[in-house]
Structure formats: structure tokens, C-alpha cells
Amino acid sequence: MDILKDKIRSEGIVLSEHVLKVDAFLNHQIDPQLMQQVGHAFATRFRDQGITKIVTIEASGIAPAVMAGLELGVPVIFARKYQSLTLKDNLYISKVFSFTKQTESTIAISAKHLNAHDHVLVIDDFLANGHAAKALIDLIGQAGASIAGLGIVIEKSFQDGRALLESEGYRVESLARVKSLAGGQVEFLD
């Protein structure tokens, strides 16, 4: 997706050979027009898959997931990273390790929103080692729902997330595939 790659080149900041900061348009400040195009791109790739729900993780996956949900006409569920007073009973629960934050979190989805009749599209802002995706897949599996695939805004192709997910039979569609962040420069795979 050329417009996304252009945005990454112009506003992304390479913090290290493994960390790309995109808080100017994706995971702190959000560019609504870009997210609308991101949602359209995911909808185009998965429109014929019979999607009934989109699942993401709070917080940075919410904007692209909502835009895809709008395009596909389906609800969006975001896994919460903590339990609150309003989210405490009948939950699907998993653990996720954040590469960027170097912490483990508990995530949860209410069982009343996801069930075995659902066919799910997973959407997230980044794919690196696949930990967040695997945690979401675990939650979806607990519900007995099926997975159409994963839509990733930015994939760090130099890490093993895609290989892990594809080896387990999951379809992965990434809108921007980063080959390298070496030398403070973003190099795309395609």
C-alpha cells in the first residue's frame, strides 16, 4: 500500500534496528483518512471470506479494525489488556508479551461477544514475533470461532511472526512489509 509506505517514510522514526515509531499517524495520533484507506484495503482483501467479526487488541489495533469493520459491515471486538469492573465474568483470557514494552499482559474478551458461529478477521497495527497475534488466536480458539486470516498494518518481515503464523496455516495480509530498519532507514520488502 503505497500511501502507507510513503507515510512511514515521511513520518516514521527508526528508534533501533527493531523498533519503528509511528505515533504520528497510527498508535498515538491517528490519521483518519489513512486509517479509512487501511480499512478499505483490508476489506478488499477479505470481503469474500464471510467475516462476521473483527478482533484486535487495545489500543493501537482499534483504529484500523474499526475502519475495516465499517467497510465490511461487521462488529469489532478489542481484547482488553486488563480486567475492569465491567469485564470480569465469562471471559476468554490469554497472555501476551509486548516486544516494544518488554512486558507481559493479560488480555480478555467477553464470551457474550464471540462464539463458535463467528468467522473472524484479526487485525493489528504491527506484526513482529507474532506474540499478540497468537494471543488473539488463542482467545478466538477458546470461543470455538474460526479465523479467516490476519490483517497487519505494518509487518516487520525481518522478524519471525509471519513464518510462525503461516506455519500454522493462517493467512497473513500485510499492507506494508518492512525488510530492514538498519542504519536508521526503513527498507520495504516489496
Swiss-Prot record:
The pathway where this protein functions is: Purine metabolism; XMP biosynthesis via salvage pathway; XMP from xanthine: step 1/1
| Reactions the enzyme catalyzes | XMP + diphosphate = xanthine + 5-phospho-alpha-D-ribose 1-diphosphate
Q: Which Pfam families match?
A: Pribosyltran
Species name: Pseudomonas aeruginosa (strain ATCC 15692 / DSM 22644 / CIP 104116 / JCM 14847 / LMG 12228 / 1C / PRS 101 / PAO1)
Q: Which residues bind 5-phospho-alpha-D-ribose 1-diphosphate?
A: 128-132
- InterPro entries in the record, alphabetically? PRibTrfase_dom (IPR000836), PRTase-like (IPR029057), Pur/Pyrimidine_PRTase (IPR050118), Xanthine_PRibTrfase (IPR010079)
The EC number on file is: 2.4.2.22
What's one GO BP annotation on this UniProt entry?
purine ribonucleoside salvage
Query: Which SUPFAM superfamilies does the UniProt entry name for this protein?
Result: PRTase-like
Q: How does it assemble?
A: Homodimer.
**Cellular location(s):** Cytoplasm
What protein name is recorded for this chain? Xanthine phosphoribosyltransferase
Q: Give the record's GO CC terms.
A: cytoplasm
Gene3D superfamilies tied to this protein: 3.40.50.2020
Q: What does this protein do?
A: Converts the preformed base xanthine, a product of nucleic acid breakdown, to xanthosine 5'-monophosphate (XMP), so it can be reused for RNA or DNA synthesis.
Q: Where does xanthine bind?
A: 20, 27, 156
Give the gene symbol. Answer: xpt
Q: Domain of life, per the record?
A: Bacteria
